[in-house]
Amino acid sequence: MTEVLLKELSNSDIDWMLATGIREEMTAGAVLIRQGQSVNALHILLDGALTVSISQAENNPLGRAFAALEGGEMSEREITRLSSGEMVGEIPFVDAYLPSTTVRALRKSLILSIPQQQLAAKLEQDVSFAAHLYRASAILLADRLERIVTQLGHSTLVFAQPQLREILFIFAQLHDSDIDWLMNAGHVNRIPAGDILIHAGRPVEALHILLDGKITLSAFEDERNPLARAFSSLEGSDTPEREFARLSRGDMVGETPFVDVRPPSVTVKALEDSLVLSIPRWRLAAKLLHDTNFAARFYKVLTVLLADKQQAIVTRLGYGRLIYSTGQPLDKSFKYENELSSDFLAQVALAGARFDWMLKRIRGS
């Protein structure tokens, strides 16, 4: 994936990262990121190979603690491998998450580590750098998510439903002017129940925001090549698909073509009569190319949503962090996976207000 960074970053971006980052050689087997422990840097693999694994959560937290005290290692399962040009670590905009995977060197490797504090400041001050890095991150995450699903089996798509409600993040991050542009650039479509919005394996022509109703996501259960799938859907053949998620108002589909050149692996269908705002792909692509501020915010949204889907797969397979359940006493010494911060709750209110404002504008037009 070396070409992703070289293609997406500018010379000044690379110069800053080289000047700010710290180079470190890792021996085979050395741990770069440990599951459940905080990370204070973004790591770029310059040379070598890394393996990403998840701990088998067969024991309770107390059992895991004793295993650590006794020097024992819980069994782990590799979910993907990373090559030169990949990035790992907690980028500041996903700092709500503790890492759910362990990353270690597969062989002798060279790492460039950029401290989180300096990176956060750079992202805040340099919008061009932010747009470039967020886009590169989204491209790498989309590719990694596809590899994880392939490694674990396509049945794990059922676990890929995000933990974040997309409306809560999308409308909290975008500015009022961004939402205004989306409304002006898009058109509102009524989708009857049963109609297909996006065909798996075929080109996606628009970004869709669900204003009202419900839609389903389903994936092919067969292993045919994408071209065969695309033409089978054109011919109306009865190809077996499995539903793995349902989305409601405020959710977004059709965003992945902006960071992944592969055709979509899911079919999007209206479960009931639905209302969607559709922004043509060519118009959004032009906006992203010419409006750097908008691009930075848009690619930031995609990066967090992709990271959240990856997190959802790991967590819902039964690996990773603690989850608080109703009726349990809270332990302040633990950070729960589904614990909400005050900042997040404030964003919820802002997102809801912006979405309602958009609906009123659309219905009033």
Feature names for model-found ranges:
Residues M1-S365:
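Cytosolic regulatory regions built on CNB/CRP/Popeye-like sensor folds
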